[in-house]
């Protein structure tokens, strides 16, 4: 197992103007980024980064600073598989040459970090790539973008950083991974930390969900305890249906059967046959009830895989005209899946979950939760409830979104579906 340094050391080094190495989850990019605070950018730091990385230097910024500086997305529909939010590239308008040298890029980076800067201080396009970090940092998205901004903020600096992926010295056509990153960090006296450790550190020191109320909910599957939560970022309310003692027989919160269910008004409430959401919710409650211990976490704000109810209905119109569920979203200028599981992970932690068996047919959901310090020991499939109205939708989820759905090829489609 690769030796990692403390988050405290990384924060101190960032504050002192040094670079650090940050590695993400092996199931995600499994790469290490060189990171330093943008306001501490010097020609020497930039030159060092260019020498040992891919050279595609990016500057993660808080969302409010991106808005203030007029940094629009590079593309209206973000198709990056990890959701990295690239904005238009920039150069400082004054005081630099062509913009590509280490000195020029350092000047642009410092200007991006300056709270007094305005959109008029930059030219577009340029040689520096700003990135928009999610509010809430690694607790919302476990990526290098958010990790770098979090480290800058923890160091008492502006929420602006510089990041780039470290290239392998053994194979220059590949990126360096954990063991080689440890050697690199030691050779250059740099701290090596993981995003998982940063998440754990922040979870110990901060809280981003609030438990508001609890009440018993008798259902056809038995009596659950409904625990209501809100987020400090928005007014969206979530509810966890809890059955039994989550701490378990050993009091450790391990091996909990969990379903993280995305809100679906049309399927869960109206019984729409266009999706399988209602039957999945019912099956999850039934499986937890049979287990006698578990959680069905109902995530509001996930309607239509996160695009909202009105956009979902518009997507249905496009599907009726022949588009599939993925292309319908994309035609509306929306991502195929905009869901964020960070708050759900915090709720599960608050409920005492340490490890779980996750009820899902969607492998991406496992990755979305696994990066938050929750150990998923097993993915438990849910029964597939196919019908003539949802069969095309299910096949698209299987073929284009990687869902583990079997036995779909023998079902006929409804006329016009």
UniProtKB/Swiss-Prot annotation:
Catalytic activity: D-ribulose 5-phosphate = (2S)-2-hydroxy-3-oxobutyl phosphate + formate + H(+); GTP + 4 H2O = 2,5-diamino-6-hydroxy-4-(5-phosphoribosylamino)-pyrimidine + formate + 2 phosphate + 3 H(+)
Keywords, alphabetical: GTP-binding, Hydrolase, Lyase, Magnesium, Manganese, Metal-binding, Multifunctional enzyme, Nucleotide-binding, Riboflavin biosynthesis, Zinc
Cofactor entry: Mg(2+); Mn(2+); Zn(2+)
Record text on cofactor binding: Binds 2 divalent metal cations per subunit. Magnesium or manganese.
Any one GO CC term of the record: cytosol
Gene3D superfamilies from the UniProt entry: DHBP synthase (3.90.870.10), GTP cyclohydrolase II (3.40.50.10990)
Region called GTP cyclohydrolase II, residue ranges: 205-417
Pathway assignment: Cofactor biosynthesis; riboflavin biosynthesis; 2-hydroxy-3-oxobutyl phosphate from D-ribulose 5-phosphate: step 1/1; Cofactor biosynthesis; riboflavin biosynthesis; 5-amino-6-(D-ribitylamino)uracil from GTP: step 1/4
Site residues (Essential for DHBP synthase activity), renumbered to this chain: 127, 165
DHBP synthase, as annotated region: 1-204
InterPro entries named among the record's database cross-references: DHBP_synth_RibB-like_a/b_dom (IPR017945), DHBP_synthase_RibB (IPR000422), GTP_cyclohydro_II (IPR032677), RibA (IPR000926), RibA-like_sf (IPR036144), Riboflavin_synth_RibBA (IPR016299)
Gene Ontology molecular function, alphabetical: 3,4-dihydroxy-2-butanone-4-phosphate synthase activity; GTP binding; GTP cyclohydrolase II activity; magnesium ion binding; manganese ion binding; zinc ion binding
Superkingdom assignment: Bacteria
NCBIfam families associated with the record: PRK00393.1, PRK09311.1, ribA, ribB
Family in the record: In the N-terminal section; belongs to the DHBP synthase family.
Known role: Catalyzes the conversion of D-ribulose 5-phosphate to formate and 3,4-dihydroxy-2-butanone 4-phosphate.
Protein name: Riboflavin biosynthesis protein RibBA
Organism: Mycobacteroides abscessus (strain ATCC 19977 / DSM 44196 / CCUG 20993 / CIP 104536 / JCM 13569 / NCTC 13031 / TMC 1543 / L948) (Mycobacterium abscessus)
This protein's encoding gene: ribBA
């Amino acid at each position: 197992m690769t030796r990692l340094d403390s988050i405290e050391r990384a924060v101190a080094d960032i504050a002192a103007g040094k670079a650090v190495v940050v590695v993400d989850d092996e199931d995600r990019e499994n790469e290490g980024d060189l990171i330093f605070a943008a306001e501490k950018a010097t020609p020497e730091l930039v030159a060092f980064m260019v020498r040992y990385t891919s050279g595609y230097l990016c500057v993660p910024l808080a969302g409010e600073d991106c808005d203030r500086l007029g940094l629009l997305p590079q593309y209206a529909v973000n198709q990056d598989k990890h959701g990295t939010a690239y904005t238009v590239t920039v150069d400082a308008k004054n005081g630099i040459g062509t913009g590509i040298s280490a000195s020029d890029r350092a000047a642009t980076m410092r200007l991006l970090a300056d709270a007094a800067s305005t959109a008029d201080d930059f030219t577009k396009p340029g040689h520096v790539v700003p990135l928009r970090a999610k509010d809430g940092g690694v607790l919302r998205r476990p990526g290098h973008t958010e990790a770098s901004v979090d480290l800058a903020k923890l160091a008492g600096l502006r929420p602006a950083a510089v990041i780039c992926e470290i290239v392998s010295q053994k194979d220059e056509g590949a990126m360096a991974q954990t063991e080689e990153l440890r050697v690199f960090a030691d050779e250059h006296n740099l701290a090596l930390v993981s995003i998982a450790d940063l998440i754990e550190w922040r979870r110990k020191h901060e809280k981003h969900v609030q438990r508001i109320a609890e009440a018993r909910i008798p259902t056809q599957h038995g009596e659950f305890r409904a625990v209501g939560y809100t987020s400090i970022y928005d007014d969206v309310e979530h509810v966890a249906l809890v059955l039994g003692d989550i701490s378990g027989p050993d009091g450790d919160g391990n091996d909990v059967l969990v379903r993280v269910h995305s809100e679906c008004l049309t399927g869960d409430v109206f019984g729409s046959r266009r999706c399988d959401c209602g039957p999945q919710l019912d099956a999850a409650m039934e499986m937890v009830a049979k287990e006698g211990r578990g959680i069905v976490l109902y995530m509001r704000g996930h309607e239509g895989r996160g695009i909202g109810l009105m956009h979902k209905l518009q997507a249905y119109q496009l599907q009726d005209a022949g588009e599939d569920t993925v292309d319908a979203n994309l035609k509306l200028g929306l991502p195929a899946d905009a869901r964020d599981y960070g708050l759900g992970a915090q709720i599960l932690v608050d409920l005492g979950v340490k490890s779980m068996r996750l009820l899902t047919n969607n492998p991406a959901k496992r990755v979305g939760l696994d990066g938050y310090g929750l150990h998923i020991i097993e993915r438990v499939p849910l029964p597939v409830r196919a019908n003539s109205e949802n069969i095309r939708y299910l096949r698209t989820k299987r073929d284009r979104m990687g869902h583990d759905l079997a036995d779909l090829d023998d079902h006929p489609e409804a006329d016009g579906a």
